[in-house]
Amino acid sequence: MRNIKLIIEFDGTNFCGWQRQIKDRTVQGCLEKAILKITGEKSLTNGSSRTDGGVHAKAMVANFITNSSIPGEKFREALNTKLPDDIAVIKSEEVDMDFHARYSSKGKMYSYTIVNRYEKLSFGKQYVHHVRKELNVEDMKKACECFIGKHDFKAFMSPGSSAKTTVRTIQEFYIEKNEDVIKIFISADGFLYNMVRIIVGTLINIGTGKTKLEDVDNIINDGIRKRSGMCVPPNGLVLEKVFY
């Protein structure tokens, strides 16, 4: 038996997330069908993140066990001939048997992109969140500093999570602005269900003035979901990198 690691990029627009489902189109489902076609084996893949529908990835990591004799680095080319156009394997390699895409991970980085302009948006809507009201980006940047470090992020989690603890450590959190495009980067040792999207919603509230900058620490410490921001749409979210 051999353990194959894949780095995958995908456009999440037309997927119902990563995790395989009986009827709906998912990234994991398409990947496992492609593996079956080239190896003749029904392999179960492990993914580094269980992304929701509409969320994209530049570097999702997956692994699977196989008895195939195909060289590890050749799986990239072989799988890409069988995968749909909105999924691509960008690297493949054989790794130690104890490697697990999810449980071996030490952290992840996500980005979220906002287009901040009053005019309607017609191009690239599947990759950004359009905010018409002018945002105070300087206040948003200051708010990022409040989130860095080890905190209980209960206020930034949607219902339905099976997480044993709501404590996470954010290592990096910063914003880059280029004209009307605001790109938010956040990396942590792990994320709760919808945590990134709710934190971004909170930043937007700060940017519009709905939430005061000085209230951020209390929102984090109180742990009350209704005090934090909305869960912004999935389309602006990208899994940028997984750390091992």
UniProtKB/Swiss-Prot annotation:
Entry keywords, A to Z: Isomerase, tRNA processing
Its job: Formation of pseudouridine at positions 38, 39 and 40 in the anticodon stem and loop of transfer RNAs.
Coiled-coil residues: none
One BP annotation, GO: tRNA pseudouridine synthesis
Species this protein is from: Clostridium botulinum (strain Eklund 17B / Type B)
Family: Belongs to the tRNA pseudouridine synthase TruA family.
HAMAP family: TruA
Catalysed transformations (reactions): uridine(38/39/40) in tRNA = pseudouridine(38/39/40) in tRNA
Protein name: tRNA pseudouridine synthase A
Binding site for substrate: Y110
Gene Ontology MF term list: RNA binding; tRNA pseudouridine(38-40) synthase activity
UniProt xrefs under NCBIfam families: hisT_truA
Entry EC number(s): 5.4.99.12
Record-annotated active site: D52
Subunit organization: Homodimer.
Gene3D superfamilies hit by this protein: Pseudouridine synthase I, catalytic domain, C-terminal subdomain, Pseudouridine synthase I, catalytic domain, N-terminal subdomain
InterPro entries: PsdUridine_synth_cat_dom_sf, PsdUridine_synth_TruA, PsdUridine_synth_TruA_a/b_dom, PsdUridine_synth_TruA_C, TruA/RsuA/RluB/E/F_N
